[in-house]
Swiss-Prot record:
<keyword id="KW-0963">Cytoplasm</keyword>
<protein>
    <recommendedName>
        <fullName>Regulator of ribonuclease activity A</fullName>
    </recommendedName>
</protein>
<comment type="function">
    <text>Globally modulates RNA abundance by binding to RNase E (Rne) and regulating its endonucleolytic activity. Can modulate Rne action in a substrate-dependent manner by altering the composition of the degradosome. Modulates RNA-binding and helicase activities of the degradosome.</text>
</comment>
<dbReference type="GO" id="GO:0060698">
    <property type="term" value="F:endoribonuclease inhibitor activity"/>
</dbReference>
<dbReference type="InterPro" id="IPR036704">
    <property type="entry name" value="RraA/RraA-like_sf"/>
</dbReference>
<dbReference type="Pfam" id="PF03737">
    <property type="entry name" value="RraA-like"/>
</dbReference>
<dbReference type="InterPro" id="IPR010203">
    <property type="entry name" value="RraA"/>
</dbReference>
<comment type="subunit">
    <text>Homotrimer. Binds to both RNA-binding sites in the C-terminal region of Rne and to RhlB.</text>
</comment>
<dbReference type="GO" id="GO:0005829">
    <property type="term" value="C:cytosol"/>
</dbReference>
<dbReference type="GO" id="GO:1902369">
    <property type="term" value="P:negative regulation of RNA catabolic process"/>
</dbReference>
<dbReference type="InterPro" id="IPR005493">
    <property type="entry name" value="RraA/RraA-like"/>
</dbReference>
<dbReference type="InterPro" id="IPR014339">
    <property type="entry name" value="RraA_gpbac"/>
</dbReference>
<comment type="similarity">
    <text>Belongs to the RraA family.</text>
</comment>
<dbReference type="GO" id="GO:0019899">
    <property type="term" value="F:enzyme binding"/>
</dbReference>
């Protein structure tokens, strides 16, 4: 499904929070939406592997990486795993790498930047926790919609027709 965040903001102005314009699109899908699962980790993506092995149909993994762009939390291998398990998208408050490969995958990926250095894989972090970045507080179960214009968040799913 294609999402237009500008149109959704016009229709649901009172019901959505708009994330500050910090993110760029790195995935093969220009727009995506779904229910989020939150993760908080810093320069370590081990927990992301565990979560992305689950079925992700209708879901988005939202990762608070502390805004660090020193190490990439998502690479092509991790994004392929997410695609294979039908995740709608990844929102990374941090960095990604192997961007040429990422843009070939049928998944939405929004992140702050790209860097060639990979993350540690020790599994340090927490999931299903409240996270805050870009002027918005995110909870697992919220609904997120993203496109090349921006990212918006709603407590409830928006009626898209």
């Amino acid at each position: 499904m294609k999402y237009d965040t500008s149109e959704l903001c016009d229709i649901y102005q009172e019901d959505v929070n708009v994330v500050e314009p910090l993110f760029s699109n790195f995935g093969g899908r220009s727009s995506f939406g779904g229910q989020i699962i939150t993760v908080k980790c810093f320069e370590d993506n081990g927990l992301l592997y565990d979560l992305l092995e689950q079925n992700g149909r209708g879901r988005i993994l939202l990762v608070d990486g502390g805004g660090s762009v020193r190490r990439a939390l998502v690479d092509a291998e991790l994004a392929r795993l997410a695609t294979q398990n039908e995740w709608e998208g990844l929102v990374i408050y941090g960095a990604v790498r192997q961007v040429d490969d990422l843009e070939e995958l049928d998944i939405g990926i929004q992140a702050l930047a790209a860097i060639p250095v990979g993350a540690a894989g020790e599994g340090i972090g927490e999931s299903d926790v409240r996270v805050n970045f870009g002027g918005v507080t995110f909870f697992s179960g919220d609904h997120l919609y993203a496109d090349n214009t921006g990212i918006i968040l709603s407590e409830d799913p928006l009626d898209i027709e």
